[in-house]
Amino acid sequence: MSKNSSRDSSPEEVSPDTETPSTTTAPKTFRELGVIDSLCEACEELGYTAPTPIQERCIPIALEGRDLIGLAETGSGKTAAFVLPMLQALMDKPQQFHSLILAPTRELAQQIAHTVEALGARISVRCTLLIGGMDMISQAIALGKKPHVIVATPGRLLDHLENTKGFSLRTLKYLVLDEADRLLDLDFGPILDKLLRLLPKRKTYLFSATMSSKVESLQRASLSDPVRVSVSTKNQTASKLLQSYLFIPHKFKDFYLVYLLNERAGQMGIIFTRTVHETQRLSIMLRNLGFPAIPIHGQLSQSARLASLNKFRARSRNLLIATDVAARGLDIPAVDYVLNYDLPQDSKTYIHRVGRTARAGKSGIAFSFVTQYEVELWLRIEDALGKKVEEYKPEKDEVMIFAERVNDAQRVAALTMRDMQDKDNKGRGPRNRKRTRDDLDQDDG
């Protein structure tokens, strides 16, 4: 256990989940929360018209100098809830290596760094991103320029603390643990414990979707007399999310997939699968049918994953085929719908997946395919949600119109996948195998 293990106690509770704002009270502004003008102007430029509930409740507490635990549903705007107070404290007393933000995944870390740079643009904030899959030397050079803020994944940060000459966090003033439950799910616990022993006394913000026993232990080890703010409840989905399921034969899943995509042509959608193989197969099949689909999964190189996300964000591709590597933490605006092509194994993952749409007050739709083999799993998910989800029943004749074209595209995808496997089997090294997977999107640049 770290030297900070005695820092806290039971957190003070603020803003219970059942609390609702008075109907006679106008929405607060960032200025009313105590945010300074230059940061308010940055919020306006980014389209932050009014604080979200997590921002409204967390920012004043953070500005008072308290340690903070924020529990909020995905898409709630929590990044700005910790970045704004952190930047305001930096402006009050500027210094190098002022703040450290830890995130569980490279993609989430990159998004947080982008938010820090955007909100801090008017005050010339220097932010450095430390993640795996990128060159250590380039990152060490960036650290040598003494940034104000570091956004990192735990493993890469520890690499630099142990190996980059002259780098330390002795003067650190703020620590943020974002997606803390995910950090612990990914077995970063031992690394976090080691990092906490290296860090000085500081203000700490911990944000999480859930408050598990592991997160409770991390809170006790890292926070001092914290205030807990909760704007979510267990197994909650966004209020403007419309959910439905399709009970279909397993062998017809691709037919129903193409039917739904055709019905929603031009909209932004994320299709979740259970395996890397299925992600690759669907990407190839759908592109052969004229759908602008791109894959993202854990076996892609970091540069390829970021390239896929950037194309999707830029709307040059409107279908993202994803494993659960993309189900959590990714801030992708304006996703119109989510489709669970393969059901997740538990309700927690279901909530994280469908939380990619209906974000920050917007509406969205979540479809789920339920086959004859998944009825029990679906009933468990419904039970955890605490409600029955409406069934969506397309006319079978309208679906089967696509059968011949889909069958042809399935054959092309199978041949392409076989060719890729043959290349793997001919002794190509890991780098080349990964590059081959990256080439799934090479045909449309």
Swiss-Prot record:
It is found in: Nucleus. It catalyses: ATP + H2O = ADP + phosphate + H(+). Residues 1-28, 415-445 are annotated as: Disordered. It is an enzyme of class 3 (hydrolase). A motif (DEAD box) lies at residues 178-181. One of its GO terms (biological process) is rRNA processing. Residues 17-28 have a biased composition (Low complexity). Belongs to the DEAD box helicase family. DDX47/RRP3 subfamily. ATP-dependent rRNA helicase required for pre-ribosomal RNA processing. Involved in the maturation of the 35S-pre-rRNA and to its cleavage to mature 18S rRNA. This is ATP-dependent rRNA helicase rrp3. It comes from Aspergillus terreus (strain NIH 2624 / FGSC A1156).
